[in-house]
Curated annotation (Swiss-Prot):
The lineage of its organism: Eukaryota, Viridiplantae, Streptophyta, Embryophyta, Tracheophyta. It catalyses: L-seryl-[protein] + ATP = O-phospho-L-seryl-[protein] + ADP + H(+); L-threonyl-[protein] + ATP = O-phospho-L-threonyl-[protein] + ADP + H(+). ATP binds at residues 80-88, 103. Belongs to the protein kinase superfamily. CMGC Ser/Thr protein kinase family. GSK-3 subfamily. The keyword Transferase applies. Absent in leaves and petioles, very low levels are seen in the stems and roots while a moderate expression is seen in the nodes. It comes from Medicago sativa. This is Glycogen synthase kinase-3 homolog MsK-3. Keywords: ATP-binding, Kinase, Nucleotide-binding, Phosphoprotein, Serine/threonine-protein kinase, Transferase. One of its GO terms (biological process) is cell differentiation.
């Protein structure tokens, strides 16, 4: 674990290093449940909160297993996001010039940070990567965990807004690329890691506007779901909440992420949210207006406690009437497979990847609108393809990409 400090609020480090007042964290840190002895050392802290523009944060990494200790300094540049969790700011590494994002969250000293534990497990081209982390404190003696993450400049949310402002539809190739990469990331976190993200929404989908590579971020709500163990149902942001969550289910599955991905795909195609309710009841009404009243069987799949509840009988609205006339039928079909009332009837992320809607991105001749190559889509690692049936594998990895795919070797 990297240790960390924050330079004085003036924003500049005194060239005379000894003039910066540095104090050790209290001894209680050694007994904190957050730490595993092997992975953490007490952080070195300098006062200040570190997020103001020009503020410099100094951390050290290494120093384990004979590695040399290395000092890294970050200059805070601007706040790029905040919420109940804390703040995310853009910073520049002064030693390398690299831009990073630093997510700063208040840390309860009694517990391990679940987001940090999850981030350490993740290694995937469509998931934002953790570079390192360190602790810092404020004058009020509050402990903060700082996650240093790779910086990706755009979000799907802002890309959607951009096309809306221009009164244009998002080019279909971007809809395909973004939704494909969401499904690939979900297949990895669900199957290889066993984690449910629980907050898939356009704001948590980062995009490089030049390459159009997408990365899922914000694992603050993510959790390993254990069958038979209850979970909180008030999870996931409105518009993207699966109906079983609105019904208060506590034994849900990773299929809640699939519903959210279906909502995002619908929004990419429409330019606006599919189910824009302000409250749980409003959202349910919006869902029922499209999918129709759930059957008793579907309600049982979502939350068995509601089977006797009397819902107004509304007929399903055909999906093709929700989208414009020229919408490719494959797009409509995929949305309908992701947005099923019964969680077990929704496509899995892997099944979505082999859907005909993505045949275009598997074509070696497909290019971005500016003529550039598509981002890497088929560089699957062995753990991503573990247990995938042969007939699915053949669809998943097109012949031209098999050289870059671990499972096919050099064949």
């Amino acid at each position: 674990m990297a240790s960390g400090g924050v330079a004085p609020a003036s924003g500049f480090i005194d060239k005379n290093a000894s003039s910066v007042g540095v104090e050790k964290l209290p001894e209680e840190m050694n007994d904190m449940k957050i730490r595993d002895d092997k992975e953490m050392e007490a952080a070195t802290i300098v006062d200040g909160n570190g997020t103001e523009t020009g503020h410099i944060i100094v951390t050290t990494i290494g120093g384990k297993n004979g590695q040399p200790k290395q000092t890294i300094s970050y200059m805070a540049e601007r706040v790029v996001g905040h919420g109940s969790f804390g703040v995310v700011f853009q910073a520049k590494c002064l030693e390398t010039g690299e831009t990073v994002a630093i997510k700063k969250v208040l840390q309860d000293k009694r517990y391990k940070n679940r987001e940090l534990q999850t981030m350490r497990l993740l290694d995937h081209p469509n998931v934002v990567s953790l570079k390192h982390c360190f602790f810092s404190t404020t004058e009020k003696d509050e402990l903060y965990l700082n996650l240093v993450l790779e910086y990706v400049p755009e979000t799907v949310s802002r890309v959607i807004r951009h096309y809306n402002k221009m009164n244009q539809r998002m080019p279909m190739i971007y809809v395909k690329l973004y939704s494909y990469q969401i499904c690939r990331a979900l297949a990895y976190i669900h199957n290889s890691i066993g984690v449910c993200h629980r907050d898939i929404k356009p704001q948590n989908l980062l995009v490089n506007p030049h390459t159009h590579q997408l990365k899922i971020c914000d694992f603050g709500s993510a959790k390993v779901l254990v069958k038979g163990e209850p979970n909180i149902s008030y999870i996931c942001s409105r518009y993207y909440r699966a109906p079983e969550l609105i019904f208060g289910a506590t034994e849900y599955t990773t299929a809640i992420d699939i519903w959210s991905a279906g909502c995002v795909l619908g929004e990419l195609l429409l330019g606006q949210p599919l189910f824009p309710g302000e409250s749980g009841v409003d959202q349910l009404v919006e869902i029922i207006k499209v999918l129709g009243t759930p059957t008793r069987e579907e309600i049982k799949c979502m939350n068995p406690n509601y089977t006797e509840f009397k819902f107004p009988q509304i007929k399903a609205h055909p999906w093709h009437k929700i989208f414009h006339k020229r919408m490719p039928p494959e797009a409509v079909d995929l949305v309908s497979r992701l947005l099923q009332y019964s969680p077990n009837l929704r496509s899995t992320a892997l099944e979505a990847l082999v859907h005909p809607f993505y045949d275009d991105v598997r074509d070696p001749n497909t290019r971005l609108p500016n003529g550039r190559f598509l981002p890497p889509l088929f560089n699957f690692k062995v753990n991503e393809l573990k247990g995938v049936p042969a007939e699915m594998l053949v669809k998943l990895v097109p012949p031209h990409a098999r050289k870059q795919c671990a499972l096919f070797g050099s064949s």
